[in-house]
Amino acid sequence: MEVEVKLRLLTAAAHLRLTTLLTPYHLKTLHQRNTFFDTPKNDLSLRRAVLRLRFLQNAAVSAASPSPPRCIVSLKAKPTLANGISRVEEDEEEIEYWIGKECVESPAKLSDIGSRVLKRVKEEYGFNDFLGFVCLGGFENVRNVYEWRGVKLEVDETKYDFGNCYEIECETEEPERVKTMIEEFLTEEKIEFSNSDMTKFAVFRSGKLP
């Protein structure tokens, strides 16, 4: 079970102010492309499951020796998001980047990957293969990661086709305590925020900003 604090930054200015204040604690910047798959009848979504390929690259590595791009396949199931605290069952593993790219162009190729996560999707949701699956599209996400007050903060700028959203995420085993700590800091620094009440996937599927 993945447990995260999720707080939405209300404006681009709030995002800029926060990332500026956190500069001394910066670890890395990740450029991510999140792409989703389901059947034409949304069989996974109807059962509160999400199948995602995440393509990412670490922009903090020097230009002289750039990090290779990576691809992570993940299954998220039974999510809840209440009072800015998210709980979701998540299973993920890395696959070859080029194979992931091929699956975006031809989702049926998901059937050819010897992936533990994809095998679980078939077994738990009753699919023989992925021949009927379609690519739903996705969105870009720029994630700045910080080591701050004993926790790892992830500050996201998510770029949908219909606009941008800004969010703080923090995975923790003490969500209430960590949420209070972050909220007090944001309030003290006059950074506008609210509890996140929709996942990024839900925003993407809604086609409009929250």
Curated annotation (Swiss-Prot):
Tissues in which the UniProt entry reports expression: Expressed only in the proximal meristematic zone of the root.
UniProt domain CYTH: residue ranges: 1-208
Temperature-dependent activity: Optimum temperature is 45.50 degrees Celsius.
Activity regulation remarks: Inhibited by 2.5 mM Ca(2+).
Subcellular location, record wording: Nucleus
InterPro entries: CYTH-like_dom_sf (IPR033469), CYTH_domain (IPR023577)
A single Gene Ontology CC term: anaphase-promoting complex
Reaction catalysed by this enzyme: triphosphate + H2O = phosphate + diphosphate; ATP + H2O = ADP + phosphate + H(+)
Knocked-out gene: effects: Delayed root growth and reduced length and number of lateral roots.
Entry annotated with the keyword Hydrolase: yes
Cofactor note: PPPase is active in the presence of Mg(2+) ions, while no activity is observed in the presence of manganese ions.
pH dependence: Optimum pH is 9.5 (in the presence of Mg(2+)). No activity at pH 7.5.
Pfam families in alphabetical order: CYTH
GO BP annotations, alphabetical order: root development
Keywords assigned by UniProt, alphabetized: ATP-binding, Hydrolase, Nucleotide-binding, Nucleus
Entry annotated with the keyword Iron-sulfur: no
Top enzyme category: hydrolase
GO molecular function annotation: ATP binding; ATP hydrolysis activity; inorganic triphosphate phosphatase activity
PROSITE patterns: CYTH
Variant or mutagenesis effect after changing R52A: Loss of 96.7% of the ATPase activity and 98.8% of the tripolyphosphatase activity
UniProt cofactor(s): Mg(2+); Mn(2+); Co(2+)
Function: Involved in the hydrolysis of the beta-gamma-phosphoanhydride linkage of triphosphate-containing substrates (inorganic or nucleoside-linked). Catalyzes the hydrolysis of inorganic triphosphate (PPPi), however it does not display significant activity towards long-chain polyphosphates. The existence of PPPi in living cells is still unclear, and PPPase activity might be the ancestral function of CYTH domain. It also has gamma-phosphatase activity on NTP substrates, but no adenylate cyclase or RNA triphosphatase activity.
Classification via PANTHER family: OS08G0299200 PROTEIN, TRIPHOSPHATE TUNNEL METALLOENZYME 3
Protein name (Swiss-Prot/TrEMBL): Triphosphate tunnel metalloenzyme 3
Lineage start: Eukaryota, Viridiplantae, Streptophyta, Embryophyta, Tracheophyta
Gene from which the chain derives: TTM3
